[in-house]
Amino acid sequence: MALVEGNNGVSGGAVSFSEEQEALVLKSWAIMKKDSANIGLRFFLKIFEVAPSASQMFSFLRNSDVPLEKNPKLKTHAMSVFVMTCEAAAQLRKAGKVTVRDTTLKRLGATHFKYGVGDAHFEVTRFALLETIKEAVPVDMWSPAMKSAWSEAYNQLVAAIKQEMKPAE
């Protein structure tokens, strides 16, 4: 798997992600990784619960009679997005920047640009991600510090994607 790196919008490209934040992300990701397919699907179902019209941004969901929770293409996409997001968060401090496997930030940016993804979509996705993680980890593990760590990691990923949001070359 190729590891693609990108500047995340922080001047100089260096990211500020503390050891404590990294530890919280790694600890929770270690628990969620085993069930990433189901958690990823719950993540996307939560996005569509908050913003039902968001499902129309996905060609494989438009005009589909298959219930969202049973749609095999959504299951595959949801898992890959969730894993990519969590892996990028887990690598953030060590790499010092956003790293993404199996794709490029340029391609992610172009895709999000093409489908008209805007700040409101990223905000809904942040909310859904944090709620999904909160529900996926043991109750006594979730804390304001863990929420903050995941939120910061997500912010860095979004900044890196936004930097590449332009038409595909």
Curated annotation (Swiss-Prot):
Location of the motif Homodimerization: 49-53, 119-131
Induction note: By flooding and etiolating but not by oxidative, nitrosative or hormonal stresses. Strong, rapid and transient induction by nitrate NO(3)(-), nitrite NO(2)(-) and nitric oxide (NO) donors, such as S-nitroso-N-acetylpenicillamine (SNAP) and sodium nitroprusside (SNP).
GO process annotations (BP): cellular response to potassium ion starvation; response to nitrate; response to nitric oxide; response to nitrite
Cofactor note: Binds 1 heme group per subunit.
Keyword Hydrolase: no
Pfam families registered for this protein in UniProt: Globin (PF00042)
Cell compartment(s), UniProt: Cytoplasm; Nucleus
Primary location class: cytoplasm
Ranges where the Globin domain occurs: 16-166
Annotated site residue numbers, Homodimerization: K147
Single GO molecular function: metal ion binding
CDD domains: class1_nsHb-like
EC code: 1.7.2.-
Reactions this protein catalyses: Fe(III)-heme b-[protein] + nitric oxide + H2O = Fe(II)-heme b-[protein] + nitrite + 2 H(+)
Tissue expression profile of the protein: Expressed in leaves, but not in roots. Present in embryonic organs including embryos, coleoptiles and seminal roots.
Cofactor: heme b
Record: residues binding heme b: S59, K73, H77, R107, T111, H112
Protein function: Phytoglobin that reduces nitrite to nitric oxide under anoxic conditions (e.g. during flooding or in waterlogged soil). May not function as an oxygen storage or transport protein. Has an unusually high affinity for O(2) through an hexacoordinate heme iron because of a very low dissociation constant. Promotes tolerance to low potassium K(+) conditions.
Stated family: Belongs to the plant globin family.
Subunit structure of this chain's protein: Homodimer.
UniProt name for this protein: Anaerobic nitrite reductase NSHB2
Organism: Oryza sativa subsp. japonica (Rice)
Gene, per the UniProt record: NSHB2
